[in-house]
């Protein structure tokens, strides 16, 4: 008698979530650098309105905001307007305890490029920051 294979769907979903961590960070960096949270301080706006204020491409910004809305960073209403959530408040520049500046720092090449070379770092036993 053979036993049924274990159900790995939950583990697969959790691991996939971790796999997409870089995407989440890149989206947070993008909206932080553009000042989206500051532009939403006065109330909800569409991605097109935010694109006009930030200089970003509207359809691409809309995709980023929708992704972040699935993570409860922003809220999207029935009119496709985006609003701040308590989490997004921490991306504003004028919020006490803001994470605005740390997100900007972590999104810069100084940090991203060495992370992309982590395999070589571990294989060679030296830091990628030297490259």
What feature does the model see in each segment?
Residues 2-55, 59-131:
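Conserved Class I S-adenosyl-L-methionine-dependent methyltransferase catalytic core
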């Amino acid at each position: 008698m053979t036993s049924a294979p274990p159900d790995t769907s939950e583990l697969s979903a959790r691991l996939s979530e971790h796999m997409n961590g870089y995407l989440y960070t890149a989206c947070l960096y993008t909206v932080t650098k553009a000042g989206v949270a500051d532009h939403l301080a006065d109330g909800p706006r569409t991605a097109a309105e935010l694109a006009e204020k930030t200089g970003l491409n509207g359809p691409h910004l809309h995709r980023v905001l929708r992704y972040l809305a699935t993570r409860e960073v922003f809220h999207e209403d029935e009119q496709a307007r985006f609003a701040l959530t308590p989490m997004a408040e921490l991306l504003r520049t004028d919020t006490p305890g803001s994470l605005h500046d740390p997100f900007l720092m972590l999104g810069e090449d100084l940090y991203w490029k060495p992370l992309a070379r982590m395999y070589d770092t571990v294989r060679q036993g030296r830091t990628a920051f030297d490259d």
